[in-house]
């Protein structure tokens, strides 16, 4: 059995096989997931697992160099945005790099998800709690 926090085999495999600049999306329960993209559905019930819990576990396994967030989160969900940016700052410190943070319209964000290797659906039920993580290299 694995020693690290991430126990979900499908998600662990996805992260392990990410190449440089490939992306993984973590989303709330409502984001539309294109049929052409692998769905890793972790949602059990409203709020379980949360967006932030899932982000924390994923970023313990994944080296991140860039993220994309929907612009609308600034107005519609500032609490999650603040917590997300705090987690990214902590990740920068842990990884020893600067993570590029980009904001795009929600419509553009959804188009970007088409290029994700997978989309991880959480039980989060708050608006615009979504992020696209782009893989970096730790060297």
From Swiss-Prot:
GO BP field: D-ribose catabolic process
Its EC number(s): 5.4.99.62
Subcellular locations according to the entry: Cytoplasm
InterPro entries linked to this entry: D-ribose_pyranase, RbsD-like_sf, RbsD_FucU
Known catalytic reactions: beta-D-ribopyranose = beta-D-ribofuranose
Pathway: Carbohydrate metabolism; D-ribose degradation; D-ribose 5-phosphate from beta-D-ribopyranose: step 1/2
Pfam families named in the record: RbsD_FucU
Keywords: Carbohydrate metabolism, Cytoplasm, Isomerase
Residues the record lists as binding substrate: 28, 106, 128-130
GO CC annotations, alphabetized: cytosol
Active site (UniProt): 20
The family this protein is said to belong to: Belongs to the RbsD / FucU family. RbsD subfamily.
Subunit structure: Homodecamer.
Free-text function comment from the UniProt entry: Catalyzes the interconversion of beta-pyran and beta-furan forms of D-ribose.
Designated name of the protein: D-ribose pyranase
Source organism of this protein record: Haemophilus influenzae (strain PittGG)
Name of the gene this protein is made from: rbsD
